[in-house]
């Protein structure tokens, strides 16, 4: 019995040692792993090459796959040199990789190693990381020096670059551009999307110069069309248009919509004469517009839109864009000057006018709940040909764009700004622009459809010449127009949802 008792303290001591050892193992082993430095994969492109060791050949083999730049890895502090190149062994998601030591950085701001980017798709340069303010415009082929960036996307691409360059006017500019329009080399920037460029490059209105521009100067790269989970787009719209006065009878129009299968409403935010309501955000931009709205109460207008939303109706806010008598009165410097016409018309080249309309669009979408903004009169005046032919017109063309370029560039700007808010963007166009030429007023159906979420053409009977019998026998004419529009849709990689306007007013 006494011998047994002598072993008890020994056993207790052994057990205590084992417990202490186990505790130390649990406590200190993870700390050792955590003590290893965490680094980030860096590159001048979205992917970082990695290597694995071929034991038979006693060398590193490059994988055909890439790791995404910006990925966090654990530096295992095991370096290996081969052919004068230093490699580090890193761990990521439980796997070990050989990575070039030069591809590891400590600071997330050092993840991007490119110092310059080139413009593939002409792009708006923004004053700030966020916001609508326009600093300048970068043209296809321009080289931009990188100053910084905002955020890394999941695929390693950059959302926005902060850049510095000298623009086409000679202005020294520091601003922000969307990374999706940039490429790493000048060769890639100057390249065109050949499959679609070849279709459009010879498009011309017979031998006559319309001064609308050449399709060769337009962008034909695919544009990713968003889908917002909290705001699904209306794919098959049966819509009704309500001008500003109709808001007063909104209950009657909702009842009419329910009775006739209408699932969407296009509601005026601004027509060519006035705002629907006093929008605070544009008060300083156009005092005349702010002080002379159709309805004095913003709340009254908002409540009418809300009734439509509550009824399950998809609400599209309409903005007359480049035909605006009130903005023109406040900003004559943004308007076209010409001896051909006495009508005051803001120029589609004017970034001041772009900005004003997008401030209004984003504010109305946020305040009233519009799910989509539809821009009408996204063009130059009908007299644009005569203005250009006269030779004395000042179109305020600061960046030396062709008319069709300006229209497409506005669409890029507007779509980007609205998409940031989860709002869709659509444009109204003349039926004529579905023809295989760029119109004198700058509209070319495929160039617009490529960019926007929905496109609404207006093949109205009264838009045709008097030689065509559009009122008593419209079907052949409308069929021919629809055939052309369908062809234009097939000539681009990312066509918009087509929603054609139908005339519902009395025949003459």
PLM regions: where:
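SH3/SH3-like beta-barrel superfamily modules
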Residues: 66-100, 139-180
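Catalytic domains of carbohydrate-active enzymes, especially glycoside hydrolases
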Residues: 250-275, 365-372, 454
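The substrate-binding groove and active-site-proximal loops of carbohydrate-active enzymes
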Residues: 236-246, 282-297, 341-355, 396-405, ...
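Glycoside hydrolase catalytic-domain groove-lining segments
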Residues: 384, 393-507
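Active-site-adjacent "subsite" loops/lids of carbohydrate-active enzymes
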Residues: 228-245, 303-306, 316-363
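Boundary regions of SH3-family modules and the immediately adjacent low-complexity/disordered segments
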Residues: 34-37, 90-118, 164-223, 227
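Aromatic-lined carbohydrate-binding/catalytic grooves of carbohydrate-active enzymes
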Residues: 260-296, 382-389
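SH3/SH3-like (including bacterial SH3b) beta-barrel domains
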Residues: 54-69, 127-143, 148
């Amino acid at each position: 019995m006494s011998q047994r008792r002598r072993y008890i303290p020994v056993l207790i001591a052994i057990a205590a040692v084992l417990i202490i050892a186990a505790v130390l193992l649990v406590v200190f082993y993870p700390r050792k792993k955590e003590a290893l430095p965490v680094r980030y994969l860096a590159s001048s492109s979205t992917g970082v090459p990695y290597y694995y060791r071929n034991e038979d050949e006693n060398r590193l083999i490059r994988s055909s796959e890439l790791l995404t730049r910006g990925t966090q890895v654990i530096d295992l502090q095991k370096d290996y040199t081969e052919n004068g190149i230093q490699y580090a062994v890193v761990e990521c998601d439980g796997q070990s990789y050989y990575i070039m030591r030069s591809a590891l950085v400590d600071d997330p701001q050092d993840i991007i190693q490119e110092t310059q980017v080139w413009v593939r798709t002409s792009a708006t340069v923004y004053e700030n990381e966020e916001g609508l303010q326009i600093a300048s415009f970068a043209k296809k082929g321009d080289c931009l020096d990188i100053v910084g960036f905002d955020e890394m996307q999941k695929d390693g691409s950059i959302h926005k670059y902060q850049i510095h360059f000298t623009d086409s006017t000679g202005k020294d500019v520091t601003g922000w551009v969307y990374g999706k329009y940039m490429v790493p080399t000048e060769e890639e920037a100057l390249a065109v999307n050949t499959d679609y460029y070849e279709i459009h490059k010879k498009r011309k209105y017979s031998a006559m110069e319309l001064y609308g521009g050449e399709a060769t100067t337009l962008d034909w790269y695919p544009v990713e069309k968003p889908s917002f989970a909290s705001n699904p787009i209306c794919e098959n719209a049966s819509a009704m248009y309500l001008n500003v006065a109709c808001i007063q009878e909104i209950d009657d129009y909702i009842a009419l919509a329910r009775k006739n299968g209408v699932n969407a409403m296009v509601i005026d935010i601004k027509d060519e004469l006035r705002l629907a309501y006093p929008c605070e955000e544009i008060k300083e931009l156009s005092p005349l517009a702010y002080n002379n709205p159709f309805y004095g109460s913003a709340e009254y207008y908002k409540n009418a839109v809300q009734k439509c939303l509550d009824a399950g109706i998809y609400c599209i806010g309409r903005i007359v864009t480049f035909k605006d008598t009130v903005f023109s009165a406040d900003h004559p410097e943004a308007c076209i000057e010409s001896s051909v016409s006495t009508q005051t018309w803001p120029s589609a080249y004017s970034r001041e006018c772009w900005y004003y309309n997008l401030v209004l669009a984003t504010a109305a979408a946020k305040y009233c709940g519009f799910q989509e903004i539809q821009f009408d009169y996204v063009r130059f005046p009908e007299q644009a040909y005569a203005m250009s032919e006269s030779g004395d017109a000042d179109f305020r063309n600061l960046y030396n764009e062709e008319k069709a370029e300006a229209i497409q560039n506005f669409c890029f700007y507007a779509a980007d700004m609205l998409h940031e808010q989860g709002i869709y963007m659509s444009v109204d166009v003349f039926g004529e622009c579905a023809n295989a030429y760029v119109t004198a007023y700058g509209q070319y159906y495929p160039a617009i459809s490529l960019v926007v979420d929905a496109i609404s053409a207006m093949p109205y009977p009264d838009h045709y010449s008097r030689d065509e019998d559009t009122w008593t026998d419209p079907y052949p004419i409308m069929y021919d127009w629809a055939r052309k529009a369908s062809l234009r849709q097939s000539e681009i990689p990312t066509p918009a949802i087509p929603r054609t306007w139908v005339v519902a007013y009395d025949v003459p």
